[in-house]
């Protein structure tokens, strides 16, 4: 019996899907706690690529119970497409459950997301424009539509008319946008409700009972620590809590249930969208890492910004999440890059150095990275099965990251397939 959380330690896209998939293969229950279809997990298994946005990665295992918690905002249109995609590949959905408390992303949320970003102009946040922020706004304004409402047509119609009327007023009178046909939305989304009704159940109760029965549970986080609404690089963050504490809130479980918290990082750093990025590489090395690592967004297709590994960031994540261990992905991408730099501290404008991540954006923007240079490696490490098989400089790199981050590196990804993992 165990309960573990998998958390991103950087700005997302760390390869959590791969680590989650490996752990999910050993779990009885896999739970998604927060976020929406703005997040994407890519899992490569048996030559088949699965791109999951809302459905937990455990769906690939027929005996694994897959749960979507109350902290998630669910886009029914995209969700049904994902259901169709899984079914077309022969994946059973019998073990899928959705908490009735989860909030629903509606068309007006998506419209308002885009209009708001457009209104901000050069000060835009760089959202995925999938309505996540506006959906969470309604949740905390206590005016949101939940999955329970969606699967009860009369309740849904009443709430949709009320919400839609107000949102159309904002869309047309504040932003000058085109109004949404509310009745058409009700008709369309009522059908989505019928489709997903059979999956609705109380996730908090299911998880609690599974724990009492001694089952192995894994909680998968979406996004990452530096996108957390409180502990990320605000305002360039998501609208929920991707940190470990957010998992407990988003699924309705107590923190004493959790046995292990695993943080996932890349062997370098990437970021999508705007905001400070101390170790960013705007040169040929950055382009090489991007192309070798396939650094393009699962959800948006946007090219990711690339940079050297930042130990200041990961140390912040170790502390904020209470990490038990780390998994480092895409070590193979760094083969042939040359000497490797690691950010060990930040230098402030007055010349002083700090080793803790700044709490506010304004301070971070003024920081310059302080690097330590390590010997690179040219060998192909994709077939290595153990830590001892790695080149000496490769092992030294991992050991240095472990020392700087103050957390054991227990897993090393050395290729895209789920089998390309070294455990130590």
Task: Identify the function of each model-found stretch.
Residues 1-424:
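Non-transmembrane, aqueous-exposed alpha-helical and coiled segments at domain scale
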């Amino acid at each position: 019996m165990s309960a573990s959380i998998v958390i991103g330690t950087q700005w997302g896209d760390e390869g959590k899907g791969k680590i989650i998939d490996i752990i999910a293969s050993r779990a009885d229950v896999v739970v998604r706690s927060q976020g929406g279809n703005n997040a994407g997990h890519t899992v490569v298994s048996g030559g088949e690529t699965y791109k999951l946005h809302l459905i937990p990665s455990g769906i690939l295992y027929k005996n694994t119970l897959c749960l979507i918690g109350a902290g998630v905002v669910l886009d029914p249109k995209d969700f049904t497409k994902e259901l169709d995609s899984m079914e077309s590949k022969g994946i059973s959905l019998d073990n899928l459950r959705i908490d009735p408390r989860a909030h629903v992303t509606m068309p007006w949320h998506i419209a308002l997301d885009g209009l708001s970003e457009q209104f901000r102009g050069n000060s835009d946040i760089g959202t995925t424009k999938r309505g996540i922020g506006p959906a969470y706004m309604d949740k905390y304004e206590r005016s949101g539509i939940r999955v329970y409402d969606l699967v009860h047509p009369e309740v849904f119609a009443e709430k949709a008319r009320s919400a839609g009327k107000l949102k159309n007023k904002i869309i047309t009178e504040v932003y000058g946008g085109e109004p949404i046909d509310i009745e058409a939305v009700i008709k369309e989304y009522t059908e989505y409700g019928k489709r997903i009704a059979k999956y609705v159940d109380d996730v908090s109760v299911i998880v609690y009972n599974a724990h009492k029965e001694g089952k192995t549970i894994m909680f998968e986080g979406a996004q990452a620590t530096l996108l957390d609404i409180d502990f990320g690089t605000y305002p360039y963050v998501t609208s929920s809590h991707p940190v470990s504490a957010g998992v407990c809130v988003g699924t309705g479980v107590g923190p004493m249930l959790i046995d292990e918290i695993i943080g996932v990082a890349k062997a370098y750093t990437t970021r999508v969208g705007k905001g400070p990025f101390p170790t960013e590489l705007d040169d040929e090395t950055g382009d090489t890492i991007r192309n070798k690592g396939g650094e393009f967004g699962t959800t948006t297709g946007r090219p990711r910004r690339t940079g050297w590994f930042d130990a200041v960031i990961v140390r912040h994540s170790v502390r904020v999440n209470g990490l038990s261990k780390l998994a480092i992905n895409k070590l193979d991408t760094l083969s042939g890059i040359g000497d490797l730099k690691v950010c060990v501290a930040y230098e402030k404008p007055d010349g002083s150095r700090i080793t803790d991540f700044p709490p506010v954006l304004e301070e971070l923007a003024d920081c310059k990275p302080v690097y330590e240079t390590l010997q690179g490696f040219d060998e192909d490490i994709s077939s290595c099965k153990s830590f001892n098989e790695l080149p000496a400089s490769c092992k030294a790199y991992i050991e240095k990251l472990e020392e700087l981050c103050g957390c054991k590196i227990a897993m090393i990804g050395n290729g895209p397939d789920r089998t390309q993992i070294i455990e130590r």
